[in-house]
Amino acid sequence: MALMSIVQFKGTYPLFGGEQASSSALDLTLDQTKDDDSDWEIKPLNIMKSRSQGFRPVYIYSNVTPDHMDQYSQEKQDQIILALTKANDDKANLSPRAEPHFFVDLAANDALVLSNTFVLEKNGWEGVCIEANPEYWYRLASFRTCTIIGAAVGGKPEDDGLEVDFALKGVLGGVVRPGLDNNEENSENVIQVKRNLVSILTIFNQTNVPHVIDYMSLDVEGAESLVMEHFPWIDYSFKFLTIERPKDDLKEKLKLNGYKMVLVLTLYGETLWIHQPSVLLPLEEIWSIAGEYNNTHFTRVTD
């Protein structure tokens, strides 16, 4: 009786910073072609080459149905962005568009719950969802069509691979560093893992992000300045952005590059920004459109 089976040798391969991760490094064919008690012939089928850095594909198989398809963002950011984009396209005579609208979601967190971009996808948008916490990857791959990047973001391309501590605490997790929401004082009893920073420009190059982006959602628990510190503003622009509690240095960079804060959408500091050269809508119209979806907490910004 002939018997064929595949076994995998479990090895390790180095990631950024020398971190070791489990991987299938060697596949072996065990082929018994004579009697049951004959010797096994071991043949190497494939040896996975060790890679020290860079992006790797992860293929997640899923056959599940979303539990709640009617999820919306926390303060109707998704509805506001859809309405503002439609109005701006009409004003610029860009309707209908030949290409889908595009978003960048950082950090994406859950695929559906409180997502700022799930509804955009339901309306035909394409985009990139960036999320460092593997807790969210399965649902993102199962329920979303966006390109998923599993990485902690920050720094400039030449510093890609810098090792940092990352707090795994759901939607409030993130890079652990002084001055950020996750710092050594409040992360002592939180699970922390080592992660490697990669610049947002490296991600954009990897995923062929268009140079004019319709919307960016930026909420990384106080690390927004770290993400955007070396951003190439001359090469990329965002028509609309929502940013949670941007620090003064990021606000200044935005203003210097043609952006204007027009609304504070929440009591916890979610702000709406426009790229003035790209958005043709007057402030009164922006406020009016936003007020149709969120008129409880938002504050108009006039200066």
Locate the predicted segments by residue:
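Phosphate/nucleotide-binding beta-alpha loop and adjacent structural elements of enzyme active sites
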Residues: M1-D303
